[in-house]
Amino acid sequence: MALLGEQSANQYRDMNLSVDSGGIEVARTQERMDELQRRMTSATAWGIEAHLLDPAQVKELVPFINEDVILGGFYCPTVSVVDSLETGTVMRKEAIEKAGCQVFANTEVLDILTDDTPRPNGRRKVTGVVTDKGTIDAEHVVVACGVWSNQIAYMADTYIPLVPAVHQMADVGPLDVLAETNNEIGYPIVRDMDTFCYERQSAGSMEVGSYAHRPILHHPDEIPSNE
């Protein structure tokens, strides 16, 4: 996973699609500091740049943090933020220009066609995709539809182990210390797993998220349409 993450990050940088904000995980307890030390060892083994920081060093990178309640932090300067919509748009454009990719926008998938002979595992071979604009013959179909992927997979009598979940996040701001950066994100993302929270800059505001809640699963059929 570390190698996959590094390769993905490098690809986004090569395409000028990422912003290297850096990321810091802070520790409030000695047990957490011990975990960060273990993580430092793993980062070194994988060749990923990382640093263990004392509270004062964390404060230098994130001036609005209260250094009195932490013992230190694990800093990875190559943590980056990527706009998924922009990234998909740029990759699609390059695929069209360089590889002859065909794109059919605003096209609804109605069904996945399969042959009549089950394989030993009980599944059938894909033969095509039915859309509201016609049928496309295909030997392979890649399902990459986010939270709606299972709806497509069901059409081929298969299943993708993916369940959407609601995540809690609060937007705080605007804050002068953030607005003065004139960036979408100018400070490192901070994770505080002793409280199961994290924060990240969003232009002049701060987004604070929490993992300290029960899992809130959400069926894709209940997600409102953009229309």
Where does each model-flagged region fall?
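Well-ordered beta-strand positions
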Residues: S18, L113, V130, D137, ...
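Conserved hydrophobic/aromatic beta-strand scaffold that supports enzyme active sites
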Residues: E25, G128, M169-D171, I189, ...
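Dinucleotide-binding Rossmann-like beta1-alpha1 core, especially the glycine-rich loop
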Residues: M1-L61, D194-E199, A203
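Central helical "cap/lid" subdomain
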Residues: T131-G186, G204
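Short aromatic/hydrophobic contact patches that present stacked aromatics
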Residues: G23-A27, G73-Y75, M169
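Conserved beta-strand segments of alpha/beta enzyme cores
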Residues: E49-H51, Q102, Y159
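Active-site lid/adjacent beta-loop-alpha segment flanking the redox-cofactor pocket in flavoenzymes
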Residues: T158-Y159, L175-E227
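Helical element adjacent to the flavin cofactor pocket in flavoenzyme catalytic cores
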Residues: F74-H140
